Amino acid sequence: MRINYCENGCMLYYKDYIDLESCKFCQRAHFRKAPSGKKVDVKAMHYLPLIPRLKRLYASNRSAPHMRWHHENRRPPGVMCHPSDGEAWKHFDRKYPEFAAEPRNIRLGLCSDGFTPYSVSAAPYSCWPVYLTPYNLPPEMCMTSPYIFLNCIIPGPLNPKIMIDVYFQPLIDELNQLWIERVETFDVSLKQNFNLWAVLMWTISDFFAYGMLSGWMKTGKLACPYCMENTKSFTLKHGQKNCWFDCHRRFLPMDHEFRNMKNEFRNNTVDRDCPPPIYTREQVWERAQHFPKVTEEQPYKFDGYGVAHNWTKQSIFWELSYWKDHLLRHNLDPMHTEKNYFDNLFNTVMDVNDKTKDNIKARMDLPEYCR
């Protein structure tokens, strides 16, 4: 499915806007004239509909019987080998018992990240594929390539940043259809029709994409999505980078010996602060709902950005009526976290040229904050 979009990524020419001649935000032309005189779209993305592929899971005997695995193979308490063993899954079951009563209803995870296609080149090019995977299947199946569905490709060359929501509109429409209207599906393993219900459980991404998907940007002093405005981060005097050194002690028990260590962590500092409050789902939604969607108006930096909050938008995922009821909405990809940490540590210890974090400014900052 080919969908045209604005040259600047402001909007999709989709549904009510499919016949517009120019972007409703920046007024860039929808089409350009080819040498033959025909109208040719300036930019287009490719979208692969989700619903037909979910229905095909029940049309094959290779997958249909396994779509009930999460329900028929319960693990004992304390054992976790599948997302269905986690509290987020069980919480959703308790919140929507009608959904949980039908084990064939599908739970999905979404993943997206940018990459440079073909090879690294001098001219930067950022392409963003979006993947969905059903978690009903057993662990040895659900993360294999036949069951990781490419949903759309967000073309480059520029990183979409917070405008990534623009490209999610067709997916959100399908997810709302799967939740509100449901889809009649034939289950070949049980030889019967049923109304398929599906839910997006969470997203998985690296820390940068986390900000793009959630709306809370991961830059500046307020980058931490848990501490939010209660962060204890500071700017390095010489390096001028944001630092979260010694922010972890506040999470220890109040009588923990580490809290009283004056020089073992940040120089000449003890920590008596309580951990930051953990906001409930309702409190997060109460904050996010006041910000506009990038699909409805052009983004801008709101009052207090970077000082009182890091919100840049209301994420498009809030259009899913059940999104505010999830216990866990966004997950970090451990592969990126581990790789970035290892690369920085290894390159610094081994003094890899142009990749080490050990530099003059870092050396000047050390005596400022450490004994």
Q: What feature does the model see in each segment?
A:
Residues 1-371:
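Domain-level cores of phosphate- or acyl-group-handling catalytic modules
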